[in-house]
Regions:
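Canonical Rossmann dinucleotide-binding motif of NAD(H)/NADP(H)-dependent dehydrogenases/reductases
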Residues: 5-36
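Substrate-binding pocket helix/loop in short-chain dehydrogenase/reductase
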Residues: 99-101, 105-113, 203
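Active-site loop immediately N-terminal to the catalytic Tyr-X3-Lys motif
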Residues: 101-102, 149-155, 177-178
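Active-site helix of classical SDR
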Residues: 124, 160, 168
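Alpha-helical segment proximal to the catalytic Tyr-Lys
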Residues: 129, 173-177
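Residue(s) in the substrate-gating loop at a strand-loop-helix junction
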Residues: 144
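Short, flexible catalytic-loop segment of classical short-chain dehydrogenase/reductase
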Residues: 182, 186-197, 201
Length: 206
């Protein structure tokens, strides 16, 4: 039987205050890990203040993952708590605009790729030195089925998720010699506020 204990493991989760990130954090905590999460949503972070493990096993910080300076500041805070981490879960991602490619605004395309791809770069770059200190490190990138199959009327989102798959495969080859595994998870539709907005936007085109 596979040992699912995460006792004494140190895990970083970006965009960890809601949705997939929060659900992942709860599972990690339940299995004994110490979790360092960040999010741009201060209201969601405030809700975590009531968590029984807050400031013991759960450390939550405000951070704009699309801003490299903010990410560096977040890691500086983590390093004050621990000198190594065992896993990084890159969960940042926005839905981006809905519409046919020829009607998209360049700024919306660029913003989607900036947030969804560059955030992974910022976090991974900072995490690798800490992961190398672990005997069995892991990077988990949250991509999407859109990164495998495409997604009509959501080309910026699909492009960003395909990019994550490419980076994942490349880093798996680069970091294997350091005993760092790199994998991507590709969820389908997840119930939540973001999906409600996507459905509402897409309904305008049907």
């Amino acid at each position: 039987m596979v040992n699912q204990s995460l006792k004494n493991k140190k895990i970083i989760i970006s965009a960890g205050a809601s949705g997939i990130g929060l659900a992942t954090a709860k599972v990690c905590l339940a299995r004994g890990a110490t979790v360092y999460l960040c999010d741009i949503d201060s209201k969601s972070l405030n809700k975590l203040n009531k968590h029984p493990l807050k400031n013991k096993k759960l450390f939550a910080y405000l951070c704009d993952a699309s801003n490299e300076y903010h990410v560096s500041d977040f890691f500086n805070k983590v390093i004050k708590k621990t000198k190594k981490i065992d896993a990084l879960i890159n969960n940042v991602g926005i839905a981006g605009p809905t519409g046919s490619l020829e009607k998209l605004k360049s700024k919306d395309w660029e913003n989607t790729l900036h947030v969804d791809v560059n955030s992974h770069f910022y976090f991974t770059k900072k995490a690798i030195p800490l992961l190398k200190k672990s005997k069995n490190g892991s990077i988990i990138n949250i991509s999407s089925t859109a990164g495998i199959l495409g997604f009509p009327l959501r080309s910026p989102y699909a492009a960003s998720k395909w990019a994550i798959i490419g980076v994942t495969k490349t880093l798996a080859m680069e970091l294997g010699k350091f005993n760092i595994r790199v994998n991507a998870v590709c969820p389908g539709t997840i119930k939540g506020d973001r999906m409600k907005r996507v459905i509402k936007d897409k309904a305008k085109f049907t």
